[in-house]
């Protein structure tokens, strides 16, 4: 690109101020501080949005540790906030991870549909995780949060999360065809148990409803006005390599990505006062920061500091989140 182009604002202010955004994914290599960054972003969004939900799709469920509060698969208000909620799901658990209330109903059909759907899904390798995402999306859309932030698992899981609408759309067709085969058996089985209200049409309707939601989500995921992805990395070779792979895959999937967070940076004010290891690490980070500047000159690149203490608890996250909105200043910002 031309040298006279102005660098983009080195913060996430552009995302926080984009009122149209509905889905924001935060991801990257393991151990780079995704959860701290996603939690901090959610805190900043809660200042300008009516209601914010942060969802952890990482089986490690670090947002409970980050906010120092236990979260479950049901949205729970974060302590110290009026409009920030959090929930944790394990996509590997499939439909068993969903709240039981989702399958409650006035007749036996809805109460047994969870088990039947799980058995049908198990017949299609690879779709279980995608269906879990699909059901979560259906639940979340019904809750009408202003914006949803995803604290994703390491890169491989993240790419599957992004691709799940296409997987589900293909898989639902197979499920509906499978339904036609098992419908007679299902009807005989439930008749023996005296559950006259249960029929294959109930399951079919549930799958059709889900397909409509997923088609809509798929369209929203590829709309940069509604969905974007924030890549988190550290200034090291493997993390930068993983970030570039992630950016390329997201671009291939049609997902907007124009923000990168470089976390855990050393800000040496006086190299003479630093230890030899710190000075060495600083030089390594400077080398990769130069590469990031060359690779992502059309991205907003936010630089975050390595702190002496861990960022944990709502007040600590609230304080750290300010670094997302304006460039970190080691002289003006006291260390936590």
UniProtKB/Swiss-Prot annotation:
Catalytic residues identified in the record: 58
Entry EC no(s): 3.6.-.-
Keyword Endoplasmic reticulum part of the UniProt annotation: yes
Amino-acid positions noted as binding ATP in the UniProt annotation, renumbered to this chain: 29-36, 236, 263
NCBIfam families reported for this sequence: GET3_arsA_TRC40
Described purpose of this protein according to its UniProt entry: ATPase required for the post-translational delivery of tail-anchored (TA) proteins to the endoplasmic reticulum. Recognizes and selectively binds the transmembrane domain of TA proteins in the cytosol. This complex then targets to the endoplasmic reticulum by membrane-bound receptors, where the tail-anchored protein is released for insertion. This process is regulated by ATP binding and hydrolysis. ATP binding drives the homodimer towards the closed dimer state, facilitating recognition of newly synthesized TA membrane proteins. ATP hydrolysis is required for insertion.
The protein's name: ATPase ASNA1 homolog
Organism: Drosophila melanogaster (Fruit fly)
